[in-house]
A protein has these predicted regions:
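N-terminal Rossmann NAD(P)H-binding glycine-rich loop of SDR-like oxidoreductase domains
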Residues: 167-185
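Conserved Rossmann-fold NAD(P)-dependent oxidoreductase catalytic core, especially the SDR/UDP-sugar
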Residues: 116, 131-132, 245, 249-252, ...
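Strand-loop microenvironment adjacent to phosphate/nucleotide-handling motifs in alpha/beta enzyme folds
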Residues: 157, 313, 317-496
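Proline-aspartate-enriched helix->loop->beta-strand connector
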Residues: 86, 90-92, 189-190, 235, ...
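Conserved Rossmann-fold cofactor-binding substructure of NAD(P)-dependent oxidoreductases
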Residues: 222-242
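NAD(P)-cofactor binding segment of oxidoreductase domains
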Residues: 103-121, 191-198, 203, 236-237, ...
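Flexible, Lys/Arg-rich cytosolic regulatory linkers and terminal tails that connect or flank
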Residues: 79, 103-166, 278
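A solvent-exposed beta-alpha-beta segment
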Residues: 10-122, 197-204, 211, 218-219, ...
Length: 496
């Protein structure tokens, strides 16, 4: 979980109940489900060091109703909401093992608990070198409470595609790039080149590899992808076989003002990387895109869609004599990335509020960083070239609901302890994001969370004309850039 880069603030956070400070009162707690893990918690929760008063087990087995397990009463519940019983008994804490209850029941229970200021804990095995292992408690993190299913790469063919290969990750010190590098580093590549223009984050990822994956042969290159001469030295030196191109600028309002940087990095940086990959015979090129590339209303989204189209054009061009497999992966917001709304809300809660939300109806798709990167790697392994892969991101989440949930997780009451203030949509922002245009269709893959978008190939002549025009970037006004992007980017309707 530390790879995700953030923790939810909670009023009382602890990992080992035996290390908790003694307090003058004990909060009541109930355990949901009678199973070996939960039964082993009884000793911890009833010890003299515990901060809790264990009231009961609550179980779906009606045969256990009124009986005792490990000296603790068991309540069997029926259709009546569990929270109603918890409120009646004044129980402010529960222990819940994810997956114990049917998914819908579990979701409703967690939602009800959050709305009623009842804290939800999960059992966790505490390893102790001096004594026998013991069960203890840990709070759920936000990803778990958003009901994101954990994804594991279990297909050995996926790992085999990257083993003993020379892999380049651009933007390798960023939120997505660094996680891609960490996951790929565990696949035993021949060499892993992590490239970024940000010095401090690149140093931090270097320290991570030295400490956690010392067996991986890594190289850390401080290079700007828009500098052709410097970038080419990396290709000439290492001869990468696989490229994950994650280098990009992503913040919508900032790039509306700094539109030339969006074009320079997101479009020309991608073009340079593609040209070098073609020149040096790279086998596979994976472009990391965004759902903001679909029907964009801002320059950032339009630049990312243009970059996707550059990949499609390069795949079909005559220069692709080595049949380099070029593909794009498209997904939504990631939890805990640099500058994400979750990090912002966390800071605002810590400061006592208010939490700022742009609009009461704005909603977004969310994924965890590890989840997104695992799907990128899986798509990269299955891709034969020319595809745009879309990920199943579950249901979209209203940002105001996310804000309220985080406030309650912090033990506060929304709009009482911490205010929520609506500030208005920023330039280029939409109420909702899409992963597919209305006219496009999808094709399934062997992975249930990955589909292929069926989209028309861009007009090569128009692409080349626009690239020539954009070469004059330093002399272009924002309006001129927008007019050029509108000629080629499907569905681009600037917010003005």
């Amino acid at each position: 979980f530390t790879l995700i880069g953030f923790r939810i603030l909670v009023k009382i956070t602890f990992q080992n109940l035996n290390q908790g400070n003694k307090i003058s009162f004990r909060e009541s707690i109930a355990i949901i489900g009678v199973n070996p893990h939960n039964i082993s918690l009884v000793e911890t929760l009833t010890s003299s060091q515990s901060n809790f008063n264990l009231v009961c087990f609550i179980d779906t087995n009606k045969g256990l109703n009124g009986k005792k397990v490990a000296g603790i009463n068991v309540l069997a519940y029926n259709k009546k909401p569990i929270v109603a019983y918890l409120r009646w008994k004044g129980i402010k804490n529960i222990v819940l093992t994810k997956g114990y209850l049917p998914e819908e029941v579990e979701e409703n229970l967690i939602e009800d608990c959050i709305n009623n200021d009842i804290k939800v804990y999960k059992p966790e095995l505490l390893e102790n070198n001096n004594t026998r292992n013991k069960e203890t408690l840990k709070t759920y993190n936000l990803e778990e409470l958003l009901f994101r299913e954990t994804i594991e790469i279990k297909n050995p063919k996926v790992i085999e595609q990257f083993r003993n290969k020379t892999i380049l990750v651009t933007g390798g010190a960023g939120s997505i790039g660094s996680e891609l590098a960490k996951q790929l580093g565990s696949f035993e590549p021949k060499e892993l080149i992590i490239l970024d223009q940000a010095e401090t984050p690149l140093y931090e990822i270097e320290m991570y590899f030295k400490k956690n994956i010392p067996s991986c042969t890594c190289h850390f290159e401080l290079v700007d992808v828009t500098n052709l001469e410097e970038f080419e030295t990396v290709f000439n030196k290492y001869r990468p076989e696989i490229i994950f191109h994650a280098a990009a600028y992503k913040h919508v309002p900032l790039l509306e003002k700094n539109f030339k940087q969006a074009i320079k990095v997101n479009i020309f940086g991608t073009k340079i990387c593609l040209d070098l990959a073609l020149k040096y015979g790279v086998n596979k090129f994976v472009y990391v895109s965004t759902d903001k590339a679909v029907n964009p209303t801002n320059i950032m989204g339009a630049s990312k869609r243009f970059a996707e189209m550059l990949g499609q054009t390069a795949y079909n061009c005559k220069k692709n004599v080595h049949k380099m497999q070029i593909m794009s992966t498209r997904f939504g917001n990631v939890l805990g990335s640099n500058g994400s709304v979750v990090n912002l809300f966390q800071e605002q809660i810590l400061a006592g509020g208010p939490i700022t939300v742009t609009h009461p109806e704005v909603n977004r798709f969310f994924m965890t960083i590890p989840e997104a990167c695992k799907l990128v790697i899986e798509a990269a392994a299955m891709g034969a070239g020319g595809q745009t892969y879309l990920f199943d991101m579950g249901r979209s989440i209203k940002i105001v609901d996310l804000a309220e949930k985080m406030i309650r997780l912090a033990g506060k009451i929304p709009n009482k302890d911490i205010k929520i203030v609506f500030t208005g949509l920023r330039p280029g922002e939409k109420l909702f994001e899409e992963v597919l245009t209305a006219s496009a269709e999808t094709l399934p893959t062997y992975h249930p969370k990955i589909v292929i978008a069926k989209e028309e190939n861009p007009c090569v002549d128009t692409m080349e004309e626009i690239m020539v025009y954009l070469q004059r970037l330093n002399h272009l006004e924002r309006k001129e850039v927008i007019e050029q992007l509108k000629l080629i980017v499907p569905g681009f309707v600037p917010y003005e």
